[in-house]
């Protein structure tokens, strides 16, 4: 009985120690992923501040003519959904293909750096060009579909970055496809309504 109790306590302590070690590793990975995104975002802010105002004005979403036309045009939702599907699926496919190579961590890090850089540059450029209205325009431009895109991408990113500890399964496949599909539908059918409603107030 004495030895049995000793073995149970030893096993319990060992399991807690292993669990604690896993928690530390998870937290470290989370911090690393967040750091890559934040670094890219900071570089994007700096880059946007170095651009000239004329150059910023020529960027598609900040061009006055583009904004006027977008606010008045009648969008064919099915065609727009098909267009979005083609341009949104490509990055997912590339990330998935490159993620299955031995450079998966480098791929994930580069993806987060580029995503953070793009967000930082666009949001800063919008403020420089249009003030607070530009920032609101950017936020509305990412609503509500971006939440689902982020959720779908995070499943892929977390899997590739923590492999082989994290394993892929049917649940992850279904969740990723579902999140991305919902994001596409919302971007095609809901976001244009929000964008046009806001542009009419400018």
Q: How would you name each of these model-derived features?
A:
Residues 24-56:
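N-terminal signal-anchor transmembrane alpha helix
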Residues 114-144, 191-192:
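Hydrophobic alpha-helical transmembrane segments of integral membrane proteins
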Residues 40-44, 48, 91, 149-152, ...:
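Alpha-helical transmembrane segments of multipass membrane proteins
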Residues 14-29, 71, 95:
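Cytosolic juxtamembrane amphipathic/interface segments immediately preceding
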Residues 98-120, 170-181:
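Cytoplasmic juxtamembrane regions at transmembrane-helix boundaries
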């Amino acid at each position: 009985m004495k030895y049995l109790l000793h073995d149970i306590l030893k096993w319990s302590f060992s399991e807690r120690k292993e669990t604690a070690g896993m928690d530390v590793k998870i937290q470290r990975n989370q911090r690393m992923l967040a750091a890559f995104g934040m670094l890219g975002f900071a570089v994007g802010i700096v880059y946007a501040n170095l651009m000239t105002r004329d150059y910023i004005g020529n960027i598609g979403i900040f061009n006055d003519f583009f904004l006027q036309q977008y606010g008045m045009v009648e969008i064919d939702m099915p065609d727009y959904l098909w267009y979005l599907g083609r341009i949104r699926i490509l990055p997912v496919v590339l990330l998935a293909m490159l993620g299955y190579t031995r450079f998966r961590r480098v791929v994930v890090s580069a993806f987060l750096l580029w995503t953070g850089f793009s967000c930082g540059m666009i949001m800063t450029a919008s403020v420089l060009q249009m003030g607070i209205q530009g920032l609101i325009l950017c936020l509305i431009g990412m609503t509500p579909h971006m939440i689902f895109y982020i959720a779908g991408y995070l499943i892929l990113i977390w899997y590739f970055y923590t492999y082989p500890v994290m394993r892929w399964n049917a649940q992850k496949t279904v969740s990723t496809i579902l999140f991305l599909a919902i994001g596409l539908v919302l971007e095609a059918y809901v976001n244009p309504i929000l964008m046009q409603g806001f542009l009419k107030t400018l």
